[in-house]
Swiss-Prot record:
Disulfide bonds join C34-C166, C56-C203, C64-C163, C215-C252, C222-C247, C234-C272, C254-C260, C262-C288, C292-C326, C309-C348, C328-C342, C350-C372, C367-C384, C370-C379, C388-C525, C410-C560, C432-C440, C571-C616, C585-C611, C598-C636, C618-C624, C626-C651, C658-C695, C671-C685, C675-C715, C697-C709, C717-C739, C737-C746, C781-C817, C799-C811, C819-C842, C836-C854, C840-C849, C858-C989, C880-C1024, C889-C986, C906-C913, C1034-C1077, C1048-C1072, C1059-C1099, C1079-C1087, C1089-C1114, C1105-C1134, C1118-C1160, C1142-C1184, C1164-C1178, C1186-C1210, C1205-C1235, C1208-C1218. GO terms for molecular function: cupric ion binding; cuprous ion binding; extracellular matrix structural constituent; identical protein binding. This is Mucin-2. The lineage of its organism: Eukaryota, Metazoa, Chordata, Craniata, Vertebrata. The gene is Muc2. Coats the epithelia of the intestines and other mucus membrane-containing organs to provide a protective, lubricating barrier against particles and infectious agents at mucosal surfaces. Major constituent of the colon mucus, which is mainly formed by large polymeric networks of MUC2 secreted by goblet cells that cover the exposed surfaces of intestine. MUC2 networks form hydrogels that guard the underlying epithelium from pathogens and other hazardous matter entering from the outside world, while permitting nutrient absorption and gas exchange. Residues 1392-1513 are annotated as: Disordered.
Length: 1513
């Protein structure tokens, strides 16, 4: 049994070797790196190393495709003044339209010198102490040490498309670079061909020089350095011999005393780090020392992203290769705030608005008290009142910060107590211009003391208490009223309500409530519960989608008509008003105006938009403009920032119009001084309210009781505080009133003589002597909660006592009152479904809803538009990569995920779009870019399962931990989080705590007002420059505005009418115009279509399906997927919820449905009812296969398992069946003279065996012999002798290489197909393999298509040949690889050959695969080598094995005599002896420790050749 066992062990060792070489080859091909270093050494993408001492300008690496060239890298080397060491003088990089010129000190982009870091369109240039780096989204990264070393890494899509000193990147060493069409080039000849000839520049080519005869004296030292313990992790990753030879050459050429080996050692370290290794510090004080600034230390391998005081967690998210350089000592971070070097985290300062704060320093900011702790603010909330504002007659901001615009025409409940009628605040909105779209706040009504007292504040400045005018100040038991300036009235109450009423230039209201009222109020000002998301809570208890739908439910008079949302922008309707508005309103944003002092405290963006809106919409432009500017000044004063002098250049007519003896002041904080206050003493005067501006009495002066701050204009008519001149017209409900002879004469606009529908009755106020309803009582279902506020008789149809108006023209009892949601009526008892699993039921006009927690969504779309998880809309045009959301927040430094958005400019205006998304989950990185996903395994982190699938136009990534990312493959990303993440995330998407007011929480935990401060704090790398402003692309491209507004008007048009009541279109329309103006360098239609699609998607989620695409407007071509004469694929604007997929059949269900996504969906026929998302076709159930996480295994295919003695297979019922793999050998070891091995038993158990090791002696043959030992794999090098002999003379044996897989073409439709050839790889391959590109496990023969795969033409698949072969009758996507063979004399390495000095017997990693012979069954067979799988059938036999192989050593022509080889189980040097007499080879191996004697030639390059095995009976 000994001999068969020895053979078995030998075969297993060969298989292990072959597998290892295969993996190394694959690992190398993934690196895609070319480099140059030291004394003119170059390494190509394919792994060739050569020396070329050229000093001209050379093409280092370029895209050499004929159709379109994306990049080129040129370099120029020079010698130092002593003429010894060479260095790179300059690097010239061209990437698409950008040209970058680098020298030791400068970086020049497109002719302009730039500072680093430099960011532009898809380009980053940065410097550190050791390197200059260039990154491009085109798929290129470059690293230069500003001395002698340059490294370029390319994306895999450039394979077989490059030229230059870096070679053609085809995966074949030497081929096409040093060997082309049978002609061999030297390194000098190859290098000279890459010369860049410049006009008027003469540069001599280097000539061939005689290499030194021997550098072997340096081998031992170079091997010692490169195999030291510092490089222990590198030995299996990088071919050491290549760098040993380079090191030997460097030392040979080195002047006396020079440290010339440093460059090669450093390059070896860089290549090791790039391959995933971790070289340790090999430098010493005497060997290539390096110095670092400050207290930094030099490390050979560290994360290129330094943790800093402002970015504490970035190193854990770094996706780049480790590198050498200066780093902070362990336990410290770099202080990028004060620049004090490396410090402990506890000593990090904090930064706020440009000011530095020491650790432990406290500040009080608005409603927070914060302390600086380790570079982060630790804050706690303070009891803080909140303010609701009604500005400009239509703009409302709730207590919780929600902003909306509503043009009303009625009395509305602004705020009232939720559980009783102790107080209520009403506001009268009415038309004040020529149209009903210009509305003003006319009256504010305070009902207090359980509505026993009614206080009305008129826009003219008068105050009425229970319809009797009172003079100010006025003090009552529960409230007091004062007039601190000519512009303002202030009201203070005993129940925590404070009012600030602005009178000039238009009436505006600011309502403040103490924290004690939180959650106790309702009305247009919201419910004051800290959650902006439910501020549109109607009087019926349901959250509405739009402002008008919400406000209409809070009418205080049932006779008022519902108002619609006005979606038009008033500015385009009047160009003169628009220009006027832009000129003056832009003062709010300019940095040189007084308003700039407040930008950090109050973001001017929203005020600027309101200012333009009101100025364009107002009949008196200046008054509305000044009101808007004063609103911003008031907001600043409330934050403690006084805008002194802002009226000096604008809105100054009132400053100089103060009545005699009064002066204008910006910070009035006390009551007016009146003659009455002298006689009575205003001890009750309110003090300490927010500063107001206006005319007031100077110190030591008083106002008499007849004085007026605001002069009254001469009025012919007076009506409810409004003075009307003769001929003026006012619209009042359904009446048109004209001022004539000092009286209002009113005419019904709608005839009231019509018949009311029963049971309503007609009320004609002209036929009543009096109708006064002083006690509020409900008259409609909508005013049940708001209650009724009646000021005058209104003619029309009303319900009789005991019945309520149901809003649909009928009268019902209270129990039958319907409910309203999104402007639709629902009868009492009806239920509707909301969001995830919540339902609402209508009961007596109010909604009763369940409150289950749901997923929340963050949206990033277009050019920098964001909607946070809590619903906050904002814009941020950053130019770098930013944290969208992560759970590395607060003190949590061990988060589980991070999602990064990469922004690049999408035009010349400075606007950016999200072009790529990086998802870090556990130990995996997913990158969504260029319409596909790339998966990369990180070196740290645990495995987190995830699945990806295409749904319609979108790619969906679902992580098992409750994260869903939906990407439209362009610029739109939706991120959904499970409720378990609530309050535990941070980033540009906010903190997911249902409160929008703290969504702008920076990385250092401070809540800021500016979207710029917020966005800048979440940049991924601290080197990214801050954004100083958000550009307005329509102002920069005014010629595009009209086109953008015309195209985007579809969002406000009737096309989306069904959605307007469910999703507010205004913000999406603004975003659409913004994006359509910004995309001015191509893709403008794509920007527009993406913007409209974003609104359409929100409509679909709100169950408002809109068919908006047409053949002329953003069409989607689904028929592309249909085979000829079939119509299976269709466009679905709102997704498809009806079909089953193979994934659902396998039990893979999404945690949340995404079937609402628009796109192309199949309608599967009955015989193929299931959709296979991976194959993208309809199949029957038995064709689905099996799924493990995101990987599909076809029916009948093998399924991997962790059980080493089990083999698993996928059945046609999508089940995975596992069976014991009986007899499988799984492990072999040797301990002294004993050999141990393990096999699989019949029931899947592991059976152990051992015996005394017996060596094998293979009889000589007439062809070749193969001898191996059974030495332990893990501890002893494997000694293998492969010798070719001949009875007469030696023959030349070819050497062969398998190419990388080639997939240059992809299937086309129509009369096309798929073709792959081996052009530029080799002219006459020996063999070819073809397989499916999308599923490499499938051979081309398994796909059932009519395909040619041969060495004559490559692969040819024609669509016309596929009739009857499948549903689509289209070719699949294939890839090929070929086996290229060359005469032995051309297979020399491009490294200078070594001498016959003995080398270590430890097997060195090779740079291309080697195929060794296998033992075959008792038959004759010819086997072609592969690098992916080696299958061997082993049969016990005592017959000798005859095989023809090629040597793994360098080519020799010799006659070999019998050789005795003795191998010990311990590493020992090898002694080579060659005799010139021909005879067979006899090899004897024993397990005794002794030197090894073998016949071998010096190794110069790895060789693979075909193996033919013949076994005699």
């Amino acid at each position: 049994m000994g001999l068969p066992l020895a053979r078995l062990v030998a075969v297993c060792l060969v298989l292990a070797l072959a597998k290892g070489l295969e993996l190394q080859k694959e690992a190398r091909s993934r690196n895609h790196v070319c480099s140059t270093w030291g004394d003119f050494h170059y390494k190509t993408f394919d792994g060739d190393v050569f020396r070329f001492p050229g000093l001209c300008d050379y093409n280092f690496a370029s895209d050499c495709r004929d159709s379109y060239k994306e990049f080129a890298v040129h370099l120029k080397r020079g010698l130092d003044k002593a003429g010894g060491h060479s260095s790179i003088e300059s690097v010239l990089i061209t990437i698409k339209d950008d040209t970058i010129y680098l020298t030791h000190k400068l970086a020049v982009v497109n002719g302009a010198m730039v500072s680093t870091p430099h960011y532009s369109s898809g380009l980053l240039i940065e410097k550190n102490d050791a390197y200059t780096k260039v990154y491009s989204r085109a798929g290129l990264s470059l690293m230069w040490n500003r001395e002698d070393a340059l490294m370029v890494e390319l994306d895999g899509r450039f394979q077989n498309h490059t030229c230059g000193l870096c070679g053609d990147f085809n995966g074949m060493q030497a081929n096409n670079e040093f060997l082309s069409d049978g002609i061999r080039f030297s390194a000098i000849e190859f290098g000279n061909m890459q010369k860049i000839n410049k006009p008027e520049v003469v540069c001599e080519d280097p000539e061939e020089v005689q290499e030194p005869e021997s550098c072997s004296e340096h081998r031992a030292e170079c091997e010692r350095l490169l195999t030291s313990t510092a490089f222990e992790d590198c030995q299996a990753r990088v071919p050491v011999e290549l760098y040993v030879l380079a090191c030997m050459h460097d030392r040979c050429q080195c002047p006396q005393g020079g440290a010339c080996e440093c460059s090669t050692l450093a390059e070896f370290s860089r290549q090791c780090s790039h391959a995933g290794g971790r070289p340790e510090n090999w430098r010493t004080a005497s060997l290539c020392p390096k110095k670092c600034p400050g207290n930094m230390v030099y490390l050979e391998s560290g994360s290129p992203w330094l943790d800093t005081c402002s970015h504490l967690e970035v190193s854990s998210l770094c996706e780049e290769h480790y590198m050498d350089g200066c780093f902070c000592p362990e336990g410290t971070v770099y202080d990028d705030i004060t620049g004090s070097g490396c410090i402990p985290v506890s000593q990090c300062h904090c930064k706020l608005h440009g000011h530095l704060y020491m650790p432990g320093q406290e500040i009080t900011n608005d409603c927070e008290q914060c302390v600086c702790n380790a570079g982060r603010w630790m804050c706690k909330d303070l009891p803080c009142p909140e303010t609701c504002a009604l500005e400009g007659g239509s703009h409302i901001t709730t207590f919780d910060g929600k902003k909306f615009t509503f043009h009303g025409d009625c009395y509305y409940v602004l705020t009232k107590t939720k559980y009783n009628d102790s107080y209520a605040l009403l506001g009268e909105l009415a038309s004040c211009g020529s149209t009903d779209k210009q509305t003003c706040l006319k009256t504010v009504v305070l009902l207090t003391d359980n509505k026993k007292n009614v206080v009305a504040f008129k826009s003219g400045g008068s105050v009425l208490l229970n319809e009797m005018e009172v003079s100010l100040p006025h003090v009552a038991a529960s409230f007091s009223i004062f007039k601190p300036s000519s512009y303002h009235i202030v009201v203070n109450t005993m129940f925590g309500l404070r009012l600030q009423i602005q009178l000039v230039p238009v009436m505006q209201l600011f309502v403040t409530l103490d924290q004690s009222a939180q959650g106790q109020v309702q009305g247009l000002c919201g419910n004051f519960n800290g959650l902006e998301s439910d501020d549109f809570m109607t009087s019926g208890g349901m959250v509405e989608a739009t402002g008008a739908g919400f406000a209409n439910t809070w009418k205080a008079q049932s006779s008022c008509h519902d108002k619609l949302d006005w979606l038009d922008d008033p500015c385009p309707l009047n160009i003169e008003s628009a220009n006027y508005a832009e000129h003056w309103c832009s003062l709010l944003k300019r940095s040189e105006t007084p308003f700039a002092r407040c930008h950090l405290a109050v973001d001017p963006t929203e005020y600027y938009k309101r200012c333009k809106y009101d100025t364009c919409n107002c009949q008196n432009n200046e008054d509305c403009m000044c009101a808007a500017l004063s609103s911003y000044a008031r907001a600043c004063a409330a934050k403690g920032v006084m805008l002194w002098g802002w009226r000096e250049s604008v809105c100054n007519k009132d400053v100089h119009a103060c009545p005699s003896s009064q002066i204008f002041m910006y910070n009035l904080t006390t009551c007016q001084q009146t003659c009455r206050s002298i006689s009575e003493g205003d001890t009750h005067c309110l003090k300490g309210f927010a500063p107001v501006e206006g005319c007031g009495c100077p110190d030591h002066t008083f106002m008499d009781e007849k004085g007026r701050c605001v002069p009254l204009s001469k009025c012919s008519c007076y009506h409810h505080g409004l003075y009307l001149e003769a001929g003026d017209v006012i619209l009042r409900q359904e009446e048109r009133c004209i001022c004539r002879n000092g009286r209002l004469q009113c005419t019904q606009v709608k005839l009231i003589g019509h018949t009311c529908l029963s049971p309503q009755i007609l009320v004609d106020c002209n036929n009543l002597t009096a109708l006064a309803i002083r006690e509020p009582r409900p008259t409609s279902c909508q005013t049940l909660v708001a209650r009724y506020y009646h000021t005058e008789c209104i003619s029309g149809c009303v319900c009789p006592d005991g019945l309520l108006d149901n809003g649909r023209g009928g009268c019902v009892v209270e129990d039958e009152c319907p409910c309203i949601h999104n402007k639709q009526f629902y009868d009492s008892g009806k239920s509707i479904k909301l969001d995830c699993n919540n339902t609402c039921t209508c009961q007596k006009g109010r909604w009763e809803c369940t409150r289950y927690a749901c997923h929340s969504t963050c949206s990033i779309y277009g050019s920098g538009h964001y909607i946070t998880f809590d619903g906050k809309h904002y814009d941020f045009d950053g130019h770098c990569s930013y944290v969208a959301v992560q759970d590395y927040c607060g003190q949590n430094s061990t988060g589980s995920f991070s999602i990064i958005t990469e922004n690049v400019p999408c035009g010349t205006t400075g606007v950016t779009c999200s072009k790529a998304i990086k998802i870090f989950i556990g130990g995996t990185e997913l990158k969504l870019v260029d319409k596909h996903r790339v998966v990369k395994q990180l070196e740290e982190g645990h495995h987190v399962p995830f699945i990806t699938r295409e749904v319609g136009l979108y790619l969906v990534v679902e992580v098992s931990s409750g994260i869903i990312v939906i990407w439209d493959k362009k610029t739109t990303i939706f991120i959904k989080l499970d409720p378990s993440y609530k309050g535990n995330v941070c980033g540009l998407c906010g903190n997911f705590d249902d409160q929008t007011k703290n969504d702008f929480t920076t990385r250092d935990h401070m809540v800021v007002a500016s979207e710029l401060d917020f966005g800048n704090s979440w940049k991924e790398a601290s080197t990214c420059p801050d954004v100083s402003h958000n550009p307005d692309p329509c102002s920069l491209n005014p010629h595009r505005r009209s086109w953008a507004e015309k195209q985007c008007s579809i969002i406000k048009s009737d096309v989306f009418l069904a959605c307007h009541g469910k999703v507010d279109p205004t913000v999406f329309y603004d975003a659409c115009v913004h994006d359509s103006c910004s995309c001015d360098t191509g893709g403008d239609c794509e920007c527009f279509c993406s913007a409209v699609a974003s609104y359409a998607q929100e409509c679909t989620k709100a169950e408002a399906c809109v068919f908006w695409r047409t053949p002329d407007l953003c069409p989607v071509f689904c028929d592309y997927y249909n085979p000829p004469d079939e119509c299976e694929w269709h466009y679905e604007p709102c997704g498809n919820r009806s079909f089953e997929t193979c994934r659902t059949l396998n039990g893979i269900h999404s945690n949340i449905s995404v079937s609402y996504l628009e796109g192309c969906y199949p309608r599967c026929p009955e015989d193929r009812p299931i959709y296979d998302e991976d194959l993208k076709k309809c199949v029957s159930g038995d064709k689905c296969g099996c799924y493990i996480e995101d990987t599909r295994y076809p029916p009948g295919g093998s399924v991997p398992t962790d059980e080493i003695c089990m083999s698993c297979t996928c059945t046609n019922t999508s089940e995975i069946i596992c069976r014991p793999d009986e007899g499988k050998i799984i492990n072999q070891t040797q301990d002294g003279i004993f050999c141990y091995w393990e096999t699989c038993g019949s029931n899947g158990t592991v059976e152990k065996h051992f015996e005394i090791c017996v060596s094998s002696t293979l009889s000589p043959t007439s062809m070749t012999s193969f001898t191996t030992t059974s030495t332990p794999i893990s501890t002893t090098p494997i000694s293998t002798t492969i010798t070719t002999t001949s009875a007469t003379a030696t023959t030349t044996v070819p050497c062969c290489f398998w190419s990388d897989w080639i997939n240059n073409n992809h299937p086309t439709s129509g009369n096309g197909g798929d073709r792959e050839n081996f052009e530029h790889v080799c002219s006459a391959p020996e063999n070819i393999e073809c397989r499916a590109a999308t599923d490499p496990k499938l051979d081309w023969t398994e796909l059932g298509q009519k395909v040619q795969c041969n060495v004559s033409e490559g692969l040819i698949c024609n669509n016309e040949d596929q009739y009857g072969t499948g549903q689509f009758e289209l070719c699949y996507d294939y890839e090929i690889r070929v086996n290229c063979c060359f005469p032995m004399e051309y297979c020399l390495s491009t490294v200078s050959p070594t001498t016959s000095t003995p080398i270590s017997s430890t097997p060195q990693p090779t740079s291309s695969p080697t195929t060794l012979p296998t033992t075959s069954p008792l038959t004759s067979s010819a086997t072609s080598p592969t690098t992916s799988h080696i299958t061997s059938t082993v049969s016990p036999t005592t017959s000798p094995t005859t095989s023809t192989t090629s040597p793994t050593t360098s080519p020799t022509t010799s006659t070999t005599s019998p050789t005795t080889s003795t191998t010990s189980p311990t590493p020992s040097p090898t002694t080579s002896t060659t005799s010139p007499t021909p005879s067979p080879t006899t090899s004897t191996t024993s397990p005794t420790p002794s030197p090894t004697t073998s016949t071998t030639s010096p190794t110069t390059s790895p060789i693979t050749s075909p193996t033919t095995s013949t076994t005699s009976p």
